[in-house]
Amino acid sequence: MKMSFRWYGKKDPVTLEEIKAIPGMQGIVTAVYDVPVGQAWPLENILELKKMVEEAGLEITVIESIPVHEDIKQGKPNRDALIENYKTSIRNVGAAGIPVVCYNFMPVFDWTRSDLHHPLPDGSTSLAFLKSDLAGVDPVADDLNLPGWDSSYSKEEMKAIIENYRQNISEEDLWANLEYFIKAILPTAEEAGVKMAIHPDDPPYGIFGLPRIITGQEAVERFLNLYDSEHNGITMCVGSYASDPKNDVLAMTEYALKRNRINFMHTRNVTAGAWGFQETAHLSQAGDIDMNAVVKLLVDYDWQGSLRPDHGRRIWGDQTKTPGYGLYDRALGATYFNGLYEANMRAAGKTPDFGIKAKTVGTKEG
């Protein structure tokens, strides 16, 4: 297992040097952020990003993400041209030696929360989705701009896209469009040596009358059966799935491990109920997920992928503007999961490797 960390490129206030100092940190999860959605990523942009990361003593373990254009999700006539661009991006990621691409097929937005600074009992704040905050709210009728929505669209464009989904695209239509996309890109991913890892809907249930399809166990089974290849896998985001209390994330994790289809791990903890959900500290007791049991499954199945501590609380005066992506709590999460990994590896009679090549600098002989 390679511990990895999300980094938003040169504009990220969290630096590669700070990330490198986290014990056992090996990988960077990032993307090319200066190419518009729908256009192909040039190889030189990817190689420039890779060089920057490697000069800091890290490696890019996952691209998160190559965004899927809304016209592909909606099955519009221009989707084939957009898919060709997507395939070019996959080829170039593979040519750069990066093994995994995380992506999603969520309509309109990547994630939705109603509060970015909801208080927790320990005095910190975190991201929350409170259904009561959104009761009666209509993103088409109201002047609404929630976190996680694609800012590249104007409000009028956003409203038109939402209305098109509501009027013309059912969940089965979205499944059909996803299947079309998967069957088009997976042969390219296989040839390029890139494993694809779809992220679940966040939250994993319907909101605002929009179709949601990557939501739980049955959806994962259906998705994996669309294209039977280890290159067609999932991002097992335990926090996203656990945001719906109906989901048994341990059973889901083991199911996907048995099929060797977890291509990326996100480990955030949440507490959830009929009221919605709130993200918590990573510690098992802080939320609803037995994180030790999750890591034990990864060890039991000799999982070799990349894991990143997903989202963090705002603690210790962290002023990072990107919600959930401050340095401090994610660094705590990384060391926590590395600790769980080492304990479970040693209990299994195995020796963990955190990629540490030197224990000090220079010679110490007199």
Swiss-Prot record:
InterPro entries membership: Man_deHydtase (IPR004628), Xyl_isomerase-like_sf (IPR036237)
EC number in record: 4.2.1.8
Catalytic reactions of this protein: D-mannonate = 2-dehydro-3-deoxy-D-gluconate + H2O
Entry superkingdom: Bacteria
Cofactor: Fe(2+); Mn(2+)
Keywords: Iron, Lyase, Manganese
GO biological process, one term: D-glucuronate catabolic process
Annotated family: Belongs to the mannonate dehydratase family.
Protein name as it appears in the record: Mannonate dehydratase
Coiled coil stretches, renumbered: none
Cited function: Catalyzes the dehydration of D-mannonate.
Name of encoding gene: uxuA
Cited PANTHER family: MANNONATE DEHYDRATASE (PTHR30387:SF2)
Molecular-function GO term, any one: mannonate dehydratase activity
Pathway linked to the protein: Carbohydrate metabolism; pentose and glucuronate interconversion
Organism: Streptococcus suis (strain 05ZYH33)
